[in-house]
Amino acid sequence: MYKHFWQKGRTFYYVSKYGRVYSTTDADSHPATWHLIATYNGKGYRRVRLQGRTFKVHRLVAEAFVPNPDQLPYVLHKDGDRENNRWDNLEWSDRQSNHGGRLNINK
């Protein structure tokens, strides 16, 4: 499953629930023809740059596929692996849980 999340002129951007971000110039094209556009930042997170703004892939996946009924501000990787951006490995969190996860206190 893919969700459209951005459009710049005639370029369309999609995120998959498996953590892949694609661009295409044809909204009706088959996903096999799309281009993977994510890179890594210095901290191990995958990111994309669109119109001068940088977006973390795990956040795009969570916003598209992980419900956030409590409007929590942070996205955690359940298994601690920053490269595992699958929707089922992500959860919304508050600041305290996010900090605790980095220190491995909450495991």
Q: What do these predicted ranges mean?
A:
Residues 1-74, 79-107:
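Conserved recognition-core residues within compact binding domains
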